[in-house]
C-alpha cells in the first residue's frame, strides 16, 4: 500500500477528516502530507485538522480533534442523547481543573470545569448528527449536570431533559444515584424519581 493509499484509508475512516497528528503518528512526514492535502483538495478547517470536500461540516467533531482533553457536556450532551428538542446555540464542554480553556472560550464554547475526581465519571461516547464519534457523558451524568446548572438554562430545556430521562425505557438508576452523590444533587434526583416513578 502506498502512502497516498494509506492516507486515503485514514481519510475514509475519519469520515472525511484527517489530522496532522494522526498522519505523523503513522510515520508520514508533514511535507508529504501537505502534498497529499493539495492533491486531494483538502480544506484546513482548524490547526492540524483537514476535511475532504464531500464531508459534512461537523463543528463538534473538529473541536474534539483539536482538543482531546474536552468532554461534551450539558446542553451538547443533551442534544447528543436526544434529550432536548432543538440544537443548542453554543457548544458545551467540560474540562479538568487546571486546563487552560481560554482558546475555547474565545471560540464561543461554553466551558465547565470540574475536579479530576469527577471528570471521567459517566464518560462515554456518542455519535454527532453527521456520524462522527465524540466523547460525552452518559445520560445519568448529563442529567445530574443539568440539575446542578438548572439556573443557567431555560426552563423548557430543563424540563424536557428531566422528562426525557425519566420517561425513557433504559435507565440505570444505581448509576444515576452514584452520579448524583458525586455531583451533590442526590436530594434533587430522588425528588424527581419519586414524582416520575412512584
Which residues make up each language-model segment?
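Glycine-centered, phosphate/nucleic-acid-interacting loop/turn motifs that mediate DNA/RNA or nucleotide
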Residues: 40
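Residues in the helix-turn-helix
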Residues: 32
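Nucleic-acid-binding surface
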Residues: 4-6, 10, 15-22, 26, ...
Amino acid at each position: 500500500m502506498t502512502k497516498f493509499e494509506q492516507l486515503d484509508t485514514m481519510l475514509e475512516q475519519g469520515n472525511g477528516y484527517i489530522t496532522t497528528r494522526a498522519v505523523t503518528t503513522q510515520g508520514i512526514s508533514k511535507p508529504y502530507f501537505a502534498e497529499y492535502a493539495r492533491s486531494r483538495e483538502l480544506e484546513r478547517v482548524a490547526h492540524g485538522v483537514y476535511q475532504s470536500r464531500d464531508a459534512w461540516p461537523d463543528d463538534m467533531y473538529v473541536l474534539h480533534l483539536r482538543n482531546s482533553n474536552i468532554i461534551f457536556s450539558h446542553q451538547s450532551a443533551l442534544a447528543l442523547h436526544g434529550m432536548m428538542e432543538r440544537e443548542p446555540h453554543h457548544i458545551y464542554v467540560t474540562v479538568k481543573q487546571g486546563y487552560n480553556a481560554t482558546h475555547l472560550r474565545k471560540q464561543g464554547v461554553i466551558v465547565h470545569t470540574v475536579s479530576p475526581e469527577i471528570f471521567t465519571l459517566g464518560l462515554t461516547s456518542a455519535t454527532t448528527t453527521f456520524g462522527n464519534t465524540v466523547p460525552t457523558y452518559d445520560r445519568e451524568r448529563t442529567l445530574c449536570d443539568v440539575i446542578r446548572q438548572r439556573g443557567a438554562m431555560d426552563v423548557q430545556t430543563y424540563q424536557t431533559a428531566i422528562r426525557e430521562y425519566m420517561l425513557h425505557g433504559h435507565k440505570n438508576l444505581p448509576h444515576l444515584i452514584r452520579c448524583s452523590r458525586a455531583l451533590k444533587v442526590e436530594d434533587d434526583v430522588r425528588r424527581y424519581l419519586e414524582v416520575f416513578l412512584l
